[in-house]
């Protein structure tokens, strides 16, 4: 347990930081915003919030002092030039004026060299240093252009800004230097630290609870945008893109989904962020002073590229167990977990049906009502018939039709891109390696037949996933870069019809090597655990712990907010006060074991209905945090979206596959035979069954039931801690099931 951190101490600390910074009232006209919380959060006591947010006000001198302190022209940071990358990297600077943990609340920026004339070291506006390392401010060349590797054209005023979100497993991310990864693309690359689960102050006080990770990333966005507006950094404030993998993918998603929503302003204000200030009447000011004029500053984003986004946690226990239970052949390790999954699956059906979801066929590209056209808006529901749909434990419906269509399309897309494979080894039906000329002559149909029958051994262009676990980001050069990995993600032994374990999914059993629930580990109970709980001796004790923890959370944090609801992006997509991104893409591995595919499906549905161009891909064979494969990349997608949505930009079309002209060097086929799961017709279209898709999904199962608010506290529990506890139970749906079915579950618990 940690000591309680007093709000009074926070106020005093903030005042001490700002003392002497000036008290002259700002006369600027500023925009005011009233907070609009999600429905689940309305009616909470906001008295603590009102008291806290009067600390930093636009009417006092605090606005001016914060803006002065966070102006890079006053900081004069260190810049280092990389000749090989032709890029300038800024040393780490603190992004706020009231940092609790400065080593975790900093920012570094990497800038393409073409946009920079040099470093002004004495403030006269001219470039004094053009290479090496120097402290000062950049002299920006706004006439220079960079043509990306995909053919898009950018300038210092129009370049996208990539914000890399860390937060591995929702953990703290220490400050790090921005990588040169995107310099050749013409992008500005931003690395930022963040507080997170298990973060503590020097006195031992716990400070890692939500929404600290997300708030620090929002503050980094504000800092960089502010300095772009000042002319201290190149880049466009209109084209910020978040990216990250796993826990980082969750935060990339949440950063975009909650763009500039006022529910987070109080937390940003408390940290001393730029461009968000409280007014004495309870409203907010969200402008900064640029050349004597007030300019709106937002923490909103233009786009999002998330890999294995582990969000929304509020839905995650239901979605994972629904997917488990959808596979009527899945073997749970205990009767308690099986029964709990059955109950949570029923809760998920009720949850989806109560939302009244719809989707436009034209937006998803699927004929869901079977009328031969893509003109309908279809209601998405889950239905139940235990006799007619026994192979999926009774579940079916239009919502699951969409789920299956996404699954089929993801496999179809994978097969359609096999022409981009460069170093695979292809075999005939008898196991003989094809000659180079035979490989060069392969048609799309030939490759599809070989793939579905498992007549191949992958090369590096088909390896798609990391080794699993809750990563911070998708890999690459320092902070920021495309994902990389070396696992194929095929179904494990016995999962597919052939029982072929050809490079199966990564080992994602997070709870197999560390003790669950220890403060330093924070791991998740694995799917192969035969014990329901090692910490609770009885179901009654377990239930009491859930009731006490969730009551604390629902009572609200220091600002009166339910932190679980704050961290639910579904609450904010399309909500009043949210600036929705123009586009979003979520790439999941189809054999992902750390979260259900239904979570990304729900995000896509919500974003599409809110007007965001939202795409999801469940990469076949991909495990946790899949790599981009077959010619795809973050840069290709960003450039394509830029060409689609920015007037005058280049329309980007993916380069055609060169085709493989020489066979690989493997000596035997290691592919998985999918013909027992997938039908492939003469027109090159494939179909699957819902039960087959569910069986494929459970083949990569890595978590017990429940998978997120785990009974012995897991890695995702720590982000919902408090000032006195670094982990708490938080899933009110799990608690509902425990209460309603206590008689049945108590007899099965730990049996």
Residue ranges and their predicted role:
Residues 207-232, 263, 636:
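Alpha/beta-hydrolase active-site loop
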Residues 46-153:
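Catalytic-loop region of hydrolases
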Residues 27-50, 447, 451, 461-530:
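Disordered, low-complexity segments in secreted/periplasmic proteins that are enriched in proline
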Residues 163-215, 256-258, 622-624:
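Cap/lid segment of the alpha/beta-hydrolase catalytic domain
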Residues 55-104, 261-476, 515-575, 696-745:
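Accessory cap/linker subdomain of secreted extracellular hydrolases
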């Amino acid at each position: 347990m940690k000591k309680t951190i007093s709000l009074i101490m926070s106020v005093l600390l903030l005042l001490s930081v700002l003392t002497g910074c000036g008290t002259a009232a700002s006369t600027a006209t500023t925009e005011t915003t009233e907070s609009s919380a999600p429905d689940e959060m309305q009616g909470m006591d906001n008295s603590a919030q009102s008291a806290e947010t009067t600390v930093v006000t636009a009417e006092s001198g605090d606005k001016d002092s914060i803006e002065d302190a966070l102006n890079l022209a006053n900081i004069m940071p260190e810049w280092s030039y990389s000749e090989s990358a032709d890029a300038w990297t800024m040393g780490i600077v603190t992004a706020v004026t009231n940092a609790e943990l400065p080593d975790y609340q900093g920012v570094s920026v990497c800038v393409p060299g073409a946009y920079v004339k040099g470093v002004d070291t004495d403030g006269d506006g001219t470039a004094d240093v053009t290479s090496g390392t120097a402290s000062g401010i950049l002299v920006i060349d706004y006439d220079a252009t960079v043509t990306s590797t995909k053919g898009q054209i950018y300038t210092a005023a129009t370049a996208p800004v990539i914000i890399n979100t860390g937060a591995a497993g929702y953990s703290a991310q220490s400050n790090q230097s921005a990588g040169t990864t995107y310099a050749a693309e013409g992008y500005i690359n931003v690395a930022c630290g963040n507080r997170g689960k298990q973060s503590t102050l020097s006195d031992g006080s716990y400070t890692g609870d939500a929404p600290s990770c997300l708030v620090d990333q929002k503050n980094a966005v504000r800092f960089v945008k502010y300095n772009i507006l000042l002319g201290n950094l190149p880049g466009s404030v209109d084209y910020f893109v978040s990216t990250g993998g796993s826990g980082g993918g969750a935060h990339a998603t949440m950063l975009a989904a909650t763009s500039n929503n006022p529910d987070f302003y109080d937390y940003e204000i408390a940290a001393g962020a730029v461009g968000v200030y409280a007014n004495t009447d309870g409203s907010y000011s969200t402008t900064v002073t640029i050349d004597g004029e007030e300019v709106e500053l937002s923490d909103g984003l233009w786009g999002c590229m998330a890999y294995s986004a582990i969000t929304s946690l509020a839905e995650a226990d239901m979605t994972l167990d629904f997917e488990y239970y959808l596979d009527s052949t899945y073997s749970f390790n205990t009767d308690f977990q099986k029964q709990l999954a059955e109950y949570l699956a029923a809760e998920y059906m009720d949850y989806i049906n109560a939302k009244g979801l719809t989707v436009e066929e034209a937006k998803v590209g699927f004929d869901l009502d079977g009328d031969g056209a893509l003109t309908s808006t279809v209601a998405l529901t889950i239905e139940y018939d235990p006799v007619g749909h026994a192979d999926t434990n009774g579940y079916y419906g239009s919502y699951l039709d969409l789920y299956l269509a996404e699954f089929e399309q993801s496999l179809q897309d994978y097969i359609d891109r096999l022409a981009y494979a460069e170093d695979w080894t292809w075999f005939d039906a008898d196991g003989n390696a094809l000659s180079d000329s035979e490989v060069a002559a392969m048609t799309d149909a030939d490759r599809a037949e070989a793939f579905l029958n498992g007549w191949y051994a992958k090369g590096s262009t088909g390896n798609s996933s990391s080794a699993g676990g809750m990563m911070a980001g998708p890999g690459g050069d320092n902070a920021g870069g495309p994902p990389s990995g070396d696992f194929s993600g095929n179904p494990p032994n016995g999962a597919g019809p052939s029982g072929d374990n050809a490079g199966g999914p990564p080992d994602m059993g997070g709870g197999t090597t560390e003790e669950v629930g220890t403060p330093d580990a924070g791991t998740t109970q694995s799917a192969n655990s035969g014990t329901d709980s090692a910490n609770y001796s009885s179901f009654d004790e377990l239930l009491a712990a859930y009731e006490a923890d969730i009551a604390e959370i629902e009572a609200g944090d220091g600002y009166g907010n339910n932190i679980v609801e704050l961290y639910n992006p579904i609450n904010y997509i399309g909500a009043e006060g949210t600036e929705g991104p123009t586009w979003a893409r979520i790439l999941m591995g189809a054999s992902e074991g750390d979260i259900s595919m239904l979570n990304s499906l729900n995000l896509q549905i919500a974003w599409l209905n809110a007007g965001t161009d939202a795409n999801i891909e469940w990469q076949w064979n991909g495990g946790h945090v899949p790599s981009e494969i077959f010619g795809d990349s973050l840069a290709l997608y960003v450039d394509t979206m830029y060409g689609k949505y920015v007037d005058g930009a280049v329309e980007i079309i993916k380069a055609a596959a060169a085709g493989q002209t020489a066979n690989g060097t493997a000596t035997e086929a290691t592919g998985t035979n999918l013909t027992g799961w997938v039908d492939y017709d003469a027109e090159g279209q494939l179909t699957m069954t819902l039960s087959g898709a569910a069986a494929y999904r459970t083949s990569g199962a890595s978590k017990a039931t429940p998978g997120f608010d785990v009974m012995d506290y897991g890695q995702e529990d720590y982000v919902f801690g408090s000032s006195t506890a670094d982990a708490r139970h938080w899933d009110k749906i799990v608690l509902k099931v425990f209460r309603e079915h206590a008689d049945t579950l108590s007899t099965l618990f730990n049996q």
